[in-house]
Swiss-Prot record:
GO terms for cellular component: cytosol. One of its GO terms (molecular function) is metal ion binding. Its EC number is 2.7.7.80, 2.8.1.11. In the N-terminal section; belongs to the HesA/MoeB/ThiF family. UBA4 subfamily. This is Adenylyltransferase and sulfurtransferase MOCS3. It is found in: Cytoplasm, Cytosol. It catalyses: [molybdopterin-synthase sulfur-carrier protein]-C-terminal Gly-Gly + ATP + H(+) = [molybdopterin-synthase sulfur-carrier protein]-C-terminal Gly-Gly-AMP + diphosphate; [molybdopterin-synthase sulfur-carrier protein]-C-terminal Gly-Gly-AMP + S-sulfanyl-L-cysteinyl-[cysteine desulfurase] + AH2 = [molybdopterin-synthase sulfur-carrier protein]-C-terminal-Gly-aminoethanethioate + L-cysteinyl-[cysteine desulfurase] + A + AMP + 2 H(+).
Amino acid sequence: MIAAANCLETEKAKLRREIAELQAALNAKEQNLRDLQSRTAASHLDPEADLQHATREQYATLNNDDIARYSRQLILSDFGVSGQLKLKNSAVLIVGLGGLGCPAAQYLCSAGCGNLGLVDYDEVERSNLHRQTLHTVARCGMSKTESARIALLELNPHCRITCYPRLLNSSNAMHIMRAYDIVLDCSDNVATRYLLNDACTMLRKPLVSGSALKLDGQLTVYSYGAQGPCYRCIYPVPPPPEAVTNCGDGGVLGAVTGTIGAMQALEAIKIIIGLGDVLAGRMLIFDGSSCQFRNIKIRSKRPNCHVCSAQPLITGLIDYELFCGMNANDKDNAVKLLEPEERINVLDYQRLMKTKAHLLLDVRAPAEFEICQLPDSINVPLAHVLDDSYLQRFAQQLESKELPIFVVCRRGNDSQIAVQHMRTRLPEHSIRDLEGGLHAWTNQVDQSFPIY
């Protein structure tokens, strides 16, 4: 009886703590909402207000606060007062306030860039916080541009910040970008890269392009100088959608995005003040696993480039989602490879798993399988499933061809690839995909199941 009472007290204490944590989170959300409502009411914003550019002032001198704040870079012989004034009078547009955009914005703002434009359509999520260092737990659910603006003004209240909380596209890109001297591509999708490249080339603005995935990063500057290539000179044709991996699928270490994002800020500063050798016509490749940097030469301008050549074929912005065959965002695109009868929804599977003998294959990588898994699932990574010799050995070990096989992955994309391949190689077996994957399981069946 005493032990049971102690267990009950422990459980009650745990529930009280959870309630307190939820109440604190709710209070923070309500405060964020009040802040946003008060700012909106104060400024009488109209629906297109986020497309109105901040007025750019030109400064001829530094004030005492500038001298005190930027003293450590002012004393650099290659920087000095003239360099600081160029920064103060500059305007930089950052597209994407994620793992690259946050450190880039942070260092540009701290260095004294006078005007920053922030473009991002998304809201802050918990999965962002390990690498997107301007955002906080309290600001989860807030627009990324607004969250970044709050953090940046705490760093440097003298920086003019204009937020564009929307998806950059062919209809608004030229209007937004025209007001800025330099554009930083901190996006995580191919369609936006082509859009930014074409717009920067047409507007004759340098494009500082960074990317990071897993433990690797890349950095270069496009559309800079007479011989500097544009993105299309290097990649005239977009890759097939199935060959593209983003951070959501492949993963990334926060310190890697921080490294590349900080160096994007450095390249922007160099361009603004005319310092050093700008990374145009070259690409910096960072290998985080060995902490090595390599600097490789890339091709010069392509004489027949469709955008930057003397006689371009593309003279206006196009439909980049159509051109690339993928969405202009970093969200995972749901693939549709299977017929409805080749799939099962998670609610039907939940009922079946308790009553019918079957085999559940999880085709995620071992590192992901270790994070969480459904009961009695077997980890067979997708690479193994696509290996015909492995698949034949697997089939030989099955007790019966009558045993139904279900396949699951994180979001229901890789599992479709696996099922499609398995059904052609093992036609005598009943093989179906778990529609929506583990994300659907969390959303529809068990909300306590971890989501990542």
